[in-house]
Amino acid sequence: MNRLLFNLFVWTKVPIAKIAGLRLRHLDDAGCQMQVTHGWLNQNPFKSMFWAVEGMAAEFSTGILAHRHIRRSGSRYAMLVVAMSATFSKKAVGTIVFRCDQGAAIAAALRLARETGAPQQVELRSVGTDESGEQVAEFFFTWSFKARMPLGTSQ
């Protein structure tokens, strides 16, 4: 998924993410980076970024990476966040980049889901850092992946 396709996807499926200022910074098989800049539309009363905007950027860094692996697999999967936790270590101001580098773990979970037919869960970590490289937040998302039957087949 390139930036143009990402923007089209966000505008049509999750427009609040675009309104909040989420941007795809980098995506390859190994990882994904999402960027969001603190501003009037995503602020909280404490002069920093609203925590849910941070969570949205963090979730996108894991979900877009999973989506890439699903598309490249040629198979169909259902994917769902089944758990989430977060810690916040510093006020989020300026530009924050959320990074997930667990593409290999996603690929392994998808492969196992396809081979066994059983849903697989994988916990993915997304770390948000500010412009100085300091960590502002850490999110953990547990994703469940279930292989679906190929189109045109029935059970």
Feature names for model-found ranges:
Residues 19, 29, 57, 79-83, ...:
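Short connector loops at helix/strand junctions that flank enzyme active sites
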Residues 23, 85-87, 99-101, 127, ...:
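Residues located in well-ordered beta-strands
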Residues 19-49:
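Catalytic strand-loop segment that frames the active site of acyl-thioester-processing enzymes
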Residues 1-19, 41:
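Alpha-helical membrane-targeting segments
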Residues 92-93, 103-155:
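HotDog/MaoC-like acyl-thioester-processing domains
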Residues 41-63:
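Hot-dog-fold acyl-thioester-processing enzymes
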